[in-house]
A protein has these predicted regions:
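Conserved small-residue
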Residues: 105-108, 122-222, 260-263, 269-295
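Glycine-rich, charged/polar anion/phosphate-binding loops
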Residues: 45-47, 214-218, 225-230
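Extracellular/periplasmic, surface-exposed regions of secreted and cell-surface proteins
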Residues: 1-168, 310, 314-393
Length: 393
């Protein structure tokens, strides 16, 4: 059993900071006014003289164990990280202060916790060159913002406090408007024109209008909370087979961009083939001749000419599960050791057939789930086959 506790500080500013010397008050010229035919002077940056390092309290409890003559090995760690003094630009300073720019301060706080572990089991099958090994690893990491510098929010769910860092936020979709009567009996939506077959949203605050005040935290973020893998290796004399799986869970992403706009002129591709299937989209009965095609639960909204501000809002309609399980690697090898090789100065030769990214299981069928959040704008994951020969002299 292991345990550790420590306090550390971060020796640099966060990567997104655009201010190099935030503790300095800077003076610059301004062209908005003059005195005696000369340019005026103004503060271009208000310095923050009381900045300090971001601090973190880190705690860890771990267990290392071996059983059955060390055939079974296990390591498990439970960790917690409490960060304070996170460097942020102030947002709650009133305009009456008359500041030309908002100062920076150590005001953010966040708590992270989770566990990490792996297990392995080795089963001898006779001699030392005959065995079976099974391994698995699992990591789960969660966090919650406990203090965040932000302007005053009208509703609690609009605040970052109490939620996961980077949680995907958007409107809650209630399917598609079935017909004009459905529109007439629903709260007004302030995202441009909309017709039957367009996305219908939930009025979260109950004020009779769906607008940006109804954007809420949805589910998870682009960063998976859970990562796991498992592998096995079988060796019988000169023959060896190994298989590796990897996966992630509790991760979501928004479908969007030109990838999901049929007939788009972009070069990144689109879903025109998927849209072409009438069962996947809302179609007016005036076009299809069948009332059943006005499906409020269709995969896609109606086809429209030009853009649709209403349908392009970030919402649960476009939020997808990014979880997947991938067959990452399979390797089959055979080792040659004989007198014939020694005539050529070789100790051994290993011939291997290797396959990478052979299969993936996921709810996402159109793109590789590990890249689905990029909506088709990145080079895809490749399936690779390799024939390999290793010579040892």
């Amino acid at each position: 059993i292991r345990a550790s506790y420590g306090r550390v500080v971060k020796d640099g500013l966060t990567f997104y900071d655009s201010v190099r010397f935030p503790y300095l008050t800077l003076i610059g010229y301004t062209g908005s006014g003059s005195w005696n035919n000369g340019s005026g002077l103004t503060e271009t940056q208000v310095g923050s003289s009381n900045l300090r390092w971001e601090k973190a309290k880190k705690a860890d409890i771990g267990i290392d164990a071996r059983f059955f003559h060390e055939r079974f090995e296990m390591t498990v760690d439970f960790f917690q990280d409490i960060r304070s003094g996170i460097y942020q630009q102030r947002q709650s300073v009133p305009e009456e202060m008359g500041l030309p720019s908002l100062p920076w301060a150590n005001v953010g706080e966040m708590k992270s916790w989770g566990m990490d572990g792996h297990i392995s089991y080795t089963q001898p099958l006779g001699d030392n060159d005959k065995y079976l090994i099974v391994r698995a690893n699992y990591t789960q990491s969660m966090n919650k913002i406990t203090n965040f510098e932000e302007d005053l929010k009208k509703y609690d769910y609009q605040s970052a406090v109490g939620y996961q860092s980077g949680v995907n936020r958007g409107l809650i979709a209630l399917g598609l408007f079935k017909d004009q009567a459905d529109i007439d009996n629903s709260p007004r939506q302030d995202f441009g024109n909309y017709l039957p077959g367009d996305i219908k949203y939930k009025d979260v605050n109950g004020d009779g209008i769906v607008n940006w005040d109804d954007i809420v935290p949805l589910k998870y973020s682009y960063v998976p909370q859970i990562q796991y893998g498992f592998a096995t290796e079988f060796n019988w004399k000169n023959f060896n087979v190994s298989v590796l799986f990897e996966g992630v869970s509790r991760v979501t992403y928004f479908k969007g961009g030109n990838m999901y706009q049929p007939f788009s002129g972009s070069t990144v591709g689109n879903v025109i083939t998927d849209f072409a299937n009438p069962a996947n989209r809302w179609i007016s009965r005036e076009i299809s001749g069948d009332p059943a095609t006005e499906n409020p639960n269709a995969k896609y909204p109606r086809l429209y000419y030009g853009g649709s501000s209403n349908n392009s809002q970030s919402s649960s309609f476009w939020l997808s599960d990014g979880s997947y399980l991938r067959l990452k690697n399979v390797q089959v090898s055979y080792t040659l050791k004989n007198q014939f090789l020694k005539k050529f100065g070789l100790q051994k030769a290993v011939i291997s057939m290797i396959g990478d990214n052979l299969a993936v299981w996921s709810k996402e069928k159109m793109l590789d789930p590990a890249q689905a959040g990029d909506n088709g704008t990145v080079y895809p994951v490749q399936r690779v086959y390799t024939l390999q020969l290793n010579l040892s002299f």
